[in-house]
UniProtKB/Swiss-Prot annotation:
PROSITE patterns: DAZ, RRM. Belongs to the RRM DAZ family. Residues 33-114 form the RRM domain. This is Deleted in azoospermia-like-B. Signal peptide: none annotated. Residues 155-180 form the DAZ domain. The lineage of its organism: Eukaryota, Metazoa, Chordata, Craniata, Vertebrata. Interacts with the C-terminus of pabp1 and with epabp. Prior to oocyte maturation, found in a complex with epabp and pum2 proteins and spdy1 mRNA; pum2 dissociates from the complex during maturation. It holds the Pfam family RRM_1. It comes from Xenopus laevis (African clawed frog). Its main location: cytoplasm. It is found in: Cytoplasm. The keyword Transmembrane helix does not apply.
Length: 286
């Protein structure tokens, strides 16, 4: 008889004996020359159990299972160094300290361990972005890019239903520094919003020296905040004010400063030139 047949016959006999004693063996591998001992009192120690089971053979190891606090769970395993008849030990009715022990073959449970699969991360294709400068060397920057035009379509076939196409929303990536604006407004319907500008006017004035010296030039900065939006009269005032240069003329006769805008100055100058031209024409005609 081969070793496999003896092991199978022994396992079948041990299972029958265990069922007859009132418990069912778990699935696993039967350990040779090892006996399961149940019903151990918490007052029993390994030395007493070793001395008791030496009648069946040379005891190699006694292992009592305990919890985290070190208290016995009431069962353990006894290993023999020699070949012993495990069936004979299981069939025998053994009482220890007035308590009947539950005997059976030692079975090691089969632990199913699933090896985790390695995680593979796919990196996107690097994008070579070259930046050239006349006064510096070329720099190459590696960064992923997403096309703003490309659309991705993913097909998900199922055996119980026809294939489905799920269209994903394209993602756009805008490069900084490159802007192109193409307005689509019809003619004469565009409206502009201007932020509130702050203008600073420098008034150049000349103060008269009371001692009779030369006029002293001075500069008086004045801040003025003007709001403008659309083509309304307020915007017209802003356009005129941005081009206005205020002149300060000193009138020695009246002893006061008169402020004349550029518009009034040009108007007076134009009238002066017209009058001068008329006088020249009259002289030539004479």
């Amino acid at each position: 008889m081969s070793g496999k047949e003896e092991s199978s016959n022994y396992a079948a006999t041990a299972e029958e004996e265990a069922v007859n004693q009132g418990f069912v063996l778990p699935e696993g591998k039967i350990m040779p020359n090892t006996v399961f001992v149940g019903g151990i009192d918490i007052t029993m120690d390994e030395i007493e159990i070793r001395d008791f089971f030496t009648r069946f053979g040379n005891v190699k190891e006694v292992k009592i299972i305990t919890d985290r606090t070190g208290v016995s769970k009431g069962y353990g395993f006894i290993s023999f160094s020699d070949e012993v008849d495990i069936q004979k030990i299981v069939k025998s009715q053994i009482s220890f300290h007035g308590k009947k022990l539950k005997l059976g073959p030692a079975i090691r449970k089969i632990c199913t361990y699933v090896q985790p699969r390695p995680v593979v991360l796919s990196h996107p294709t690097p994008f070579h972005h070259a930046w050239n400068n006349q006064n510096a060397d070329s720099y190459i920057q590696h960064s992923p890019i997403v096309s703003p035009i490309t659309q991705y379509v993913q097909a998900c076939p199922y055996p119980s239903s026809p294939p489905m196409a799920i269209q994903q929303i394209p993602v756009g990536c805008q490069q900084p520094g490159y802007f192109q604006v193409s307005p689509q407004w019809p003619a004469d319907q565009r409206s502009y919003m201007f932020p509130t500008p702050a203008f600073t006017f420098n008034y150049h004035c000349c103060d008269m020296d009371p001692n009779g010296g030369e006029p002293i030039p001075r500069e008086y900065p004045i801040d003025q905040t003007v709001s403008a939006s659309g083509a309304n009269p307020q915007k017209r005032y802003v356009e005129m004010s941005t081009q206005t240069i205020v002149s300060c003329l000193f009138d020695p006769a009246n002893k006061f400063h008169s402020f004349v805008s550029q518009e009034d100055y040009l108007k007076d100058n134009r009238v002066h030139h017209l009058r001068r031209r008329e006088s020249v024409i009259k002289r030539v005609s004479k």
